[in-house]
């Protein structure tokens, strides 16, 4: 599983998805992007799950 990310490519295990989420838990006016491979991607706001080379918003 290879997902396009902001800078380059991210490779995940076959049974995993690449997920990134915007959060502001550290700086209220400065969004932080959390990203990584996971087996289940949460469907909360600002989440994007990737499969193969396409992302579903």
From Swiss-Prot:
Effect annotated for changing residue 7 to A: Small decrease in inhibition of rat muscle alpha-1-beta-1-delta-epsilon (CHRNA1-CHRNB1-CHRND-CHRNE) and neuronal alpha-3-beta-2/CHRNA3-CHRNB2 nAChR
Effect of residue 29 to A: No change in inhibition of rat muscle alpha-1-beta-1-delta-epsilon (CHRNA1-CHRNB1-CHRND-CHRNE) and small increase in inhibition of neuronal alpha-3-beta-2/CHRNA3-CHRNB2 nAChR
Main location class: secreted
UniProt-annotated site: Important residue for interaction with muscle alpha-1-beta-1-delta-epsilon (CHRNA1-CHRNB1-CHRND-CHRNE) and neuronal alpha-3-beta-2/CHRNA3-CHRNB2 nAChR, residues: 46
Annotated consequence of substituting residue 45 to A: Small decrease in inhibition of rat muscle alpha-1-beta-1-delta-epsilon (CHRNA1-CHRNB1-CHRND-CHRNE) and neuronal alpha-3-beta-2/CHRNA3-CHRNB2 nAChR
Effect of residue 25 to A: Complete loss of inhibition of rat muscle alpha-1-beta-1-delta-epsilon (CHRNA1-CHRNB1-CHRND-CHRNE) and small decrease in inhibition of neuronal alpha-3-beta-2/CHRNA3-CHRNB2 nAChR
Tissue-specific expression: Expressed by the venom gland.
Effect on the protein upon substituting residue 26 to A: Important decrease in inhibition of rat muscle alpha-1-beta-1-delta-epsilon (CHRNA1-CHRNB1-CHRND-CHRNE) and no change in inhibition of neuronal alpha-3-beta-2/CHRNA3-CHRNB2 nAChR
Disulfide bonds: 3-19, 12-37, 41-49, 50-55
Site feature: Key residue for inhibition of muscle alpha-1-beta-1-delta-epsilon (CHRNA1-CHRNB1-CHRND-CHRNE) and important residue for inhibition of neuronal alpha-3-beta-2/CHRNA3-CHRNB2 nAChR: 27
Residues at the site labelled Key residue for inhibition of muscle alpha-1-beta-1-delta-epsilon (CHRNA1-CHRNB1-CHRND-CHRNE) nAChR: 23
Molecular-function annotations in GO: acetylcholine receptor inhibitor activity; ion channel regulator activity; toxin activity
Effect of residue 24 to A: Small decrease in inhibition of rat muscle alpha-1-beta-1-delta-epsilon (CHRNA1-CHRNB1-CHRND-CHRNE) and small increase in inhibition of neuronal alpha-3-beta-2/CHRNA3-CHRNB2 nAChR
Site-annotated residues for Important residue for inhibition of muscle alpha-1-beta-1-delta-epsilon (CHRNA1-CHRNB1-CHRND-CHRNE) nAChR: 24, 26
Recorded family membership: Belongs to the three-finger toxin family. Short-chain subfamily.
Function, as annotated: This toxin binds and inhibits rat muscle adult alpha-1-beta-1-delta-epsilon/CHRNA1-CHRNB1-CHRND-CHRNE (IC(50)=3.1 uM) and fetal alpha-1-beta-1-gamma-delta/CHRNA1-CHRNB1-CHRNG-CHRND (IC(50)=5.6 uM) nicotinic acetylcholine receptors (nAChR). Shows a very low inhibition on rat neuronal alpha-3-beta-2/CHRNA3-CHRNB2 nAChR (IC(50)=50.2 uM) nAChR. Binds to the acetylcholine-binding pocket and acts as a competitive antagonist. Does not inhibit human glycine receptor (homopentamer composed of alpha-1 subunits, GLRA1), but seems to potentiate it (about 2-fold increased activity).
The protein, known as: Neurotoxin Oh9-1
Organism: Ophiophagus hannah
